[in-house]
Regions:
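Short, strongly hydrophobic alpha-helical membrane anchors
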Residues: 1-17, 410
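Alpha-helical membrane-protein architecture signal
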Residues: 7-10, 14, 57, 61, ...
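Alpha-helical transmembrane segments in multi-pass membrane proteins
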Residues: 23, 27, 31, 35, ...
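Hydrophobic core segments of alpha-helical transmembrane domains in multi-pass membrane transport
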Residues: 32-37, 128-139, 201-209, 242-246, ...
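Transmembrane helical segments that form the transport core of multi-pass membrane transport proteins
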Residues: 42, 48, 184-265, 270, ...
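Juxtamembrane and boundary regions of transmembrane helices in multi-pass small-molecule transporters
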Residues: 53, 58, 120-165, 289-373
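Membrane-interfacial helix-loop connectors
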Residues: 67-125, 213-306
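Membrane-interfacial, low-structure loops and terminal tails that flank and connect transmembrane helices
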Residues: 157-184, 369-385
């Protein structure tokens, strides 16, 4: 690769990353507005009071509460721990965790933008299958003693929370200005939780789309880019390599979607892409946090459950879609690359939802000053993973700025 060619590819990679983000911006905003409103008006305390210990109803409630929660993996992990410690059953708690990272509204919008309706259906139907397979595996393995030991560990380490927490009526809250100010605070907290993952994910996706040759994907994912329907062993290999690839990206589900679109554009099977998307809970930061909460034995048990469930789900979804003739065919080009910055529906949707963000910013910071406590999230010293992500995001911004300069002067 000569020097001139590198600078051309560099600028192309950066423009691709920015094009990815521009294409997805309205979907991010819409998803986080809906998610923030639901989280404010349906509180964690209400979830704790409603979810039971076990049974179909409790699993269904855990799934529903996950669906209406934040898509941030780290927030979902903390909420799952809290629900489990408060008495929610192990399976309903894991159902909440899986739903909050695979069934949330905003994720569906982003998948629709980058991958199309088949993957949206695959995400939601597959997400439900993922929970069912997880439930079956737990019932088969019956880790009763381990669950009892872990719950005791949590209660001994953190103590019991107050049981008499007052749960506000959402019907009254939704009619108040203060309620919508809380929505605005939650909206910007959502962005604060995911900005690093999104920045890194979109930057890496643009770089991979331009710099990594198609032959690499064909080597990594057996049968990719060859057309037709690969054999079962190739599909199985794709569903195993998908989580491995996600493990090394170690970014959240929202940041992984543009990378999934790159895999799809390079001919990776439907099963492989679905497995990659479902793998945000089998990455190292999540394993480490689970170990911190529950101990390494439970962390590896959860890892094993999720890996087995997502491989089974991806295979079932692939052959189910194939049976009904619904398997999508890759065009060889990511949908987000086709027209990056045209004056089209994406442009007007972005303008409209940026205006919504402006209104939320006014609600958050306009008018009278409020106590700072509402915006604080997480608190304390940042973890090593958070610091690594922060500096990787800064490097990403430097990379993007350099590419824009290269695009202007080339």
């Amino acid at each position: 690769m000569n020097n001139a060619n590198f600078w051309q590819l560099y600028s192309e990679a950066v423009l691709t990353s920015l094009g990815f983000f521009w294409k997805a911006l309205w979907a991010f905003i819409l998803g986080y507005v809906i998610s923030s409103a639901i989280q404010v008006f349906v509180t964690r305390e209400r979830m704790k009071q409603t979810m039971g210990e076990a049974g179909k109803g409790s699993v269904a409630l855990g799934t529903f509460f996950g669906f209406i929660s934040s898509s941030c993996s780290f927030a979902a992990l903390a909420t799952t721990k809290s629900l489990f410690k408060k008495g929610a059953g192990f399976v309903p708690s894991l159902a909440f965790l899986l739903a909050s990272t695979n069934l949330v509204v905003e994720l569906g919008f982003i998948i629709a933008v980058f991958l199309g309706w088949q993957f949206v259906v695959g995400e939601y139907v597959g997400g439900l299958l993922l929970i069912i397979f997880m439930w079956l595996i737990v019932r088969f393995t019956r880790p009763t003693k381990l669950i009892r030991k872990v719950r005791k560990r949590l209660r001994d380490n953190e103590g019991e929370a107050n049981e008499g927490e007052d749960v506000p009526d959402w019907k009254e809250k939704i009619q108040t200005l203060q309620g919508w100010k809380q929505v605005a605070r939650k909206y910007f907290m959502e962005w604060m939780m995911v900005w690093k993952d999104v920045t890194i994910g979109f930057t890496v996706a643009g770089a991979i789309a331009v710099f990594v040759p198609r032959s690499f994907f064909q080597f990594l994912f057996i049968g990719s880019g060859q057309g037709g329907n690969p054999g079962f062993l190739a599909i199985l290999e794709n569903t195993i390599i998908g989580p491995v690839a996600a493990f090394f990206t170690f970014i959240g589900s929202m940041g992984n979607i543009p990378l999934a679109s790159v895999l799809y554009a390079n001919g990776v099977s439907f099963a492989g892409v679905i497995a990659f998307i479902f793998s945000d809970l089998v990455v190292f930061p999540v394993i480490r946090i689970n170990a911190k909460y529950y101990g390494w034995k439970m962390a590896f048990y959860i890892l094993g459950i999720f890996l087995a469930a997502l491989v089974a789900t991806a295979i079932v979804m692939h052959y189910g879609f194939s049976l009904f003739g619904l398997l999508p065919e890759s065009t060889g080009q990511s949908q987000a690359e086709t027209q990056r910055f045209a004056i089209d529906y994406t442009f007007w949707l972005n303008i409209a939802f940026l205006a919504v963000t402006g209104v939320l910013a006014w609600l958050r910071w306009g008018g009278k000053k409020e106590h700072k406590g509402g915006m604080h999230h997480g608190g304390g010293k940042k973890s090593i993973i958070e610091r690594v992500l922060f500096w990787l995001a800064i490097v990403s911004y430097i990379w993007l700025a350099g590419g824009l300069i290269a695009a202007v002067i080339k």
